[in-house]
Amino acid sequence: MMNDRRDFMIASLMAFAAPALRVEGRIEGQQPTANASRPVATKDAPKVNLDGWQMTATEITIPPGAPPGRKHRHPGFVIGYVLEGQYSFAVNDQAPQVINAGQMFFESFDAPGEVHSASGNASATQPVKFLAIVFTKKGDPVTIPG
């Protein structure tokens, strides 16, 4: 049993994100190569005891030119990874941040329940796809209208 929250978060992220990030197949005649890894992001874990918490992993795709999502918040915190495209989001009416494919983002780490005032696709021509892993207390909703 994992009691350390950091070990739990790392194991959780690996369990949900790793399958989404793998690339399958190879060119005919190509020899298999050793797996490569690279750090994507490092951030201190939130100071919470995760006993009685759950996580929900959701893959979200937003088409190009789609209107921004409605204001919302999460009662816990979010670890996100952009799989393709460019994701734009803002918290508490701050200037939007653009997160590119291959980058991670963190929401509500310092203050669970922050209002996400903007959330959408930063591109008018390409879709954005990202993985959001939301940690909440068991029984709490994943998302609450803003």
Which positions does each model-derived feature cover?
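N-terminal secretory signal peptides and thylakoid transit peptides that target proteins
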Residues: 1-19
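A short glycine-rich, His/Asp/Glu-containing loop-to-beta-strand
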Residues: 35-71, 133
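Short acidic-glycine-tyrosine-enriched beta hairpin
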Residues: 94-111
